[in-house]
């Protein structure tokens, strides 16, 4: 399994084509419009798009996942993510968990109701949208 933020699509492709990875979990920080703000650093969005497209076009078994943060994610972001990744095989929402290792202080998790609302917004675009840790 390879965990990636998608910043190196050429490496991702080389690893997948060489059959060195059997599964890829790619972090999707936010909608493309808010990607850099959420990542907290400059991001080459073309590389992120290229990695996502490679996976969606059958490059490897994969899932996309977003760690949802109350202060950084809104409903319209979920719709934009859904439009961007429409038809993705699997998409997980993961609620933020605060810890001493978090790079930014003052962030908080969403309520269960907010997580369910985000899931409902994504389902029309990505039918296999799940909340990590949710039963059933």
Name each model feature, range by range.
Residues 1-112:
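Conserved AdoMet/S-adenosylmethionine-binding subsite of the radical SAM
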Residues 116-136:
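A C-terminal junction/extension of Radical SAM enzymes
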């Amino acid at each position: 399994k390879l965990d990636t933020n998608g910043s190196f699509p050429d490496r991702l492709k080389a690893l997948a084509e060489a059959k060195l990875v059997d599964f890829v979990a790619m972090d999707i920080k936010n909608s493309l419009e808010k990607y850099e703000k959420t990542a907290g650093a400059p991001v080459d969005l073309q590389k992120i798009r290229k990695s996502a497209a490679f996976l969606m076009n059958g490059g490897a078994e994969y899932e996309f996942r977003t760690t949802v943060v109350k202060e950084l994610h809104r409903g319209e972001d979920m719709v934009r993510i859904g439009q961007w990744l429409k038809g993705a095989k699997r998409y997980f929402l993961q609620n933020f968990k605060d810890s001493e290792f978090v790079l930014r202080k003052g962030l908080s998790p969403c309520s269960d109701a907010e997580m369910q609302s985000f899931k409902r917004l994504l389902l029309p675009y990505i039918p296999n949208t799940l909340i990590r840790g949710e039963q059933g």
